[in-house]
């Protein structure tokens, strides 16, 4: 079945083989050690380590090309790739050459590719401003949305209320990581600043009023099952609330988050939903339809 991928981080898609191509001094053992972690804080360190291997626009382009090829092989026809623009700026890399290289790769791909620029929430709103500005400048040129990721506890969504309002006024769609490693209050804050989709959001299951609000407002959760298990956001696969959220009527889209770091694919996430949680083929088909329904660019998604 055709699917769309709505929550995948470019920098989290870098396979070990690609890292070896980017840095010939690395060994597989070093890569394995650097990308091993036991909790969310450790995962963030691994994510930063991979980011630091991306030094040139051509490096980003290579990673994007490999990602698009893998997605195409899985039957993905539309993708919204999250680019950690905040990390690009933190590394003091010029953003324009990086984005231009990515845009060229996207244009070559048979998949429809759109971009979500992501700011680092724990760095604060002032540091996020340039990311939001870069996103607004590229509305209509591949960028469809802006969001915040990173450490929820050290970067609450309310800090970004003004930036989200300004982004919406400039034509950007809005997403926000929330309810991944912290409780329902984080999701309430994301909704309060205007988030139209919630990255992860699995802790919503703890708050009946929040579940009702998500249903009422038709705000989908971008659920990444393997990611949540690997980072310790849930204590075990059996404890993951994806099926309970689905049964309650919460809109859900399945995604991979960081497929290379979590050793998963979009196809394997659908298979996992069926195998571990009893999603039927009809329900999997509905999840696939959701992936297009909740895309930020309907023309590009529905047209595929």
Please report, for each region that a protein language model flagged, where it lies by residue.
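Metal-cofactor-binding active-site regions of metalloenzymes
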Residues: 1-172, 183-186, 192, 196-197, ...
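Glycine-rich beta-to-alpha transition loops that act as phosphate-gripper elements at the mouths
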Residues: 177-182
């Amino acid at each position: 079945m055709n699917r769309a991928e709505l929550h995948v981080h470019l920098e989290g898609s870098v396979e070990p083989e690609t890292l070896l191509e980017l840095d010939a001094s690395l060994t597989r053992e070093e890569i394995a050690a650097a990308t091993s972690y036991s909790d969310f804080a450790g995962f963030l360190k691994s994510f930063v380590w991979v980011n630091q291997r991306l030094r040139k626009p051509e490096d980003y382009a290579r990673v994007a090309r490999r990602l698009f090829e893998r997605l195409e092989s899985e039957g993905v026809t539309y993708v919204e790739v999250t680019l950690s623009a905040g990390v690009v700026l933190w590394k003091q890399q010029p953003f324009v050459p990086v984005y231009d290289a990515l845009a060229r790769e996207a244009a070559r791909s048979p998949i429809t590719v759109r971009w979500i620029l992501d700011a680092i929430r724990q760095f604060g709103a002032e540091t996020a401003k340039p990311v939001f500005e870069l996103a607004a400048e590229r509305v209509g040129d591949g960028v469809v949305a802006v969001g915040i990721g990173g450490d929820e506890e050290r970067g609450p969504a309310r800090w970004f209320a003004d930036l989200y309002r300004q982004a919406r006024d400039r034509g950007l769609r809005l997403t926000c990581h929330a309810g991944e490693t912290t409780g329902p209050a984080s999701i309430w804050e994301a909704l309060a600043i205007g988030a139209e989709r919630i990255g992860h959001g699995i802790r919503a299951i703890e708050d009946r009023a929040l579940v009702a609000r998500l249903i009422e407002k038709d705000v989908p959760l971008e659920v990444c099952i393997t990611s949540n298990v690997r980072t310790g956001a849930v204590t075990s696969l059996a404890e993951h609330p994806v099926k309970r959220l689905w049964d309650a009527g919460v809109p859900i889209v399945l995604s991979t988050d960081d497929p290379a770091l979590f050793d998963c694919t979009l196809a394997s996430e659908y298979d996992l939903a069926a195998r571990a949680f009893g999603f039927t083929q009809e329900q999997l088909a509905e999840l696939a339809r959701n992936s297009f329904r909740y895309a930020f660019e309907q023309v590009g998604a529905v047209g595929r």
